[in-house]
Amino acid sequence: MKLKKILLTLGLLFFATQVFAVKAKIRFLFPVSSKSVVDGFDNSTIKTSEFVLAFMMPLSQHTQLGLGYSYLNARIKDPLTSSEGYYGSFRAHLLELGAGYSGFELTRTISLVFESAVRIPVSGEAELQGNETTQNATGISGMGYYFSSGLEYGNLEISLFYQRRNLSFDGLTVTRSAKSTDVALHITEYGIAFGYTF
């Protein structure tokens, strides 16, 4: 876990030192459609929020490489009809590696922009309460993917996005009818992303 944090810090510092070329982009994601499966929770609803900060290094006039940070917050709760009454809160810090292209100009000031990225969890925290017990995660693993296409106007960007995340939290299990299941999040989302580059 410490090694992952060190690698993330060194990577961000490397990009930050290239100040003459690097731009920072902040991105807010607003899902409009989602499909979530949480192992151990069959009839529960998960609520998520996410924030992304990326450093973009130009490879050419219209192509950029990105290194960034994604923060995911998720909560899930058993329905009232459940006798176990499980409630879980999950937080994940992910390293984002991606690329973007904005070479298709619609007008002199508006361009089409395409982005894709892979997200790797570097650390996370989670707590699971229920069945008269409280559990805390001991680690996190998994992978995430992000794709978007949209319009870029100056420093502003609006895009339609698709993303999927598969995250497992070590040390968390749900027990129902004497059967234990390891907790993992499988989240697929479609929505609108708003970005600003500075």
What feature does the model see in each segment?
Residues 20-65, 70-77, 189, 195-197:
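Short glycine/proline- and aromatic-enriched beta-strand/turn motifs that initiate or cap beta-hairpins
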Residues 24, 85, 94-102, 111-123:
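Detector for outer-membrane/organellar transmembrane beta-barrel domains
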Residues 24-26, 61-67, 106-110, 155-160:
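Repeated loop/turn-to-beta-strand initiation elements of outer-membrane beta-barrel proteins
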Residues 28-34, 69-75, 101-103, 118-124, ...:
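Transmembrane beta-strands of outer-membrane beta-barrel pores
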Residues 32-45, 70-92, 122-141, 168-185:
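Flexible, solvent-exposed loop segments that connect beta-strands
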Residues 51-59, 69, 97-101, 116-118, ...:
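Residues on the lipid-exposed face of transmembrane beta-strands in outer-membrane beta-barrel proteins
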Residues 78, 144-198:
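Predominantly the C-terminal beta-signal and adjacent terminal strand-loop region
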